């Protein structure tokens, strides 16, 4: 179990989820991931100005992962070239140009990340990308989750909501999320019923275990509430 910092109401949801898992026979180990604080460290993020008019952080610098921006352009270009049919869009620059030509339709939330990604070559050859990728794998995989699983003899790690997405996604490790409960407040703002999920993440090729764990918890907790819209 690892969840870092959480608001009190979200902690209460997690506490109930842990009780359910223990009732099912799970053995829970609460332990820190030693390199969790390395994620997003120097050399792994890029400064991008937030120009989204609907964002409370407009005008501030965002720090998206370097690897994400480089791989976004590379992956999207390959998809548009090899798989997209019925469209004139063949690369990211075409998408950016379309958005600029149709601002009311396409730029309601800006395209800061697309513009930042477009500044890269798109072939993953740059030193900045390769260096950031190596640091990500060292922090998230080699000295992170791999060491964590070995040291504590774990089958999976449990994260609240998407709190584990940053570290599990970097080495490409699988995760599955199921409903855990609801809270009435998010970042100090009241919400009617804001859903909180429970994420099960595991090492490479552990999808079969994760699906069994998540299904057993989902059936026992019965926290899924279909949307009413």
Segments from the language model and where they lie:
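Short hydrophobic beta-strand segments
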Residues: 1-6, 40
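Flexible, glycine/charged-enriched surface loops at secondary-structure junctions
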Residues: 25-34, 87-93, 225-228
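Short connector loops at secondary-structure junctions
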Residues: 26-54
């Amino acid at each position: 179990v690892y969840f870092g910092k959480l608001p009190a109401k979200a902690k209460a949801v997690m506490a109930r989820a842990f009780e359910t898992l223990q009732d099912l026979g799970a053995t829970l180990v609460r332990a820190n991931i030693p390199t969790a604080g390395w994620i997003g460290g120097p050399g792994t993020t890029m400064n991008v100005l937030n120009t989204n008019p609907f964002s409370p952080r407009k005008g501030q610098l965002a720090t998206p992962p370097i690897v994400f921006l480089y791989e976004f352009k590379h992956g999207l270009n390959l998809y548009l070239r090899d798989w997209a049919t019925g469209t004139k869009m063949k690369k990211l620059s075409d998408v950016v140009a379309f958005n600029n030509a149709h601002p009311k339709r396409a730029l309601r939330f800006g395209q800061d990340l697309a513009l930042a990604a477009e500044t890269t070559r798109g072939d993953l050859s740059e030193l900045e990308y390769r260096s950031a990728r190596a640091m990500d794998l060292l922090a998230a995989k080699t000295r992170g989750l791999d060491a964590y699983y070995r040291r504590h003899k774990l089958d999976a790690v449990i994260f609240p909501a998407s709190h584990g997405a940053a570290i599990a996604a970097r080495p490409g490790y699988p995760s599955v999320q199921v409903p855990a409960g609801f809270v009435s407040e998010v970042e100090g703002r009241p919400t009617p019923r804001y859903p909180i999920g429970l994420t099960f993440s595991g090492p490479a090729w552990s999808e079969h275990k994760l699906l069994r764990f998540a299904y057993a918890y989902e059936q026992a907790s019965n926290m899924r509430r279909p949307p009413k819209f």
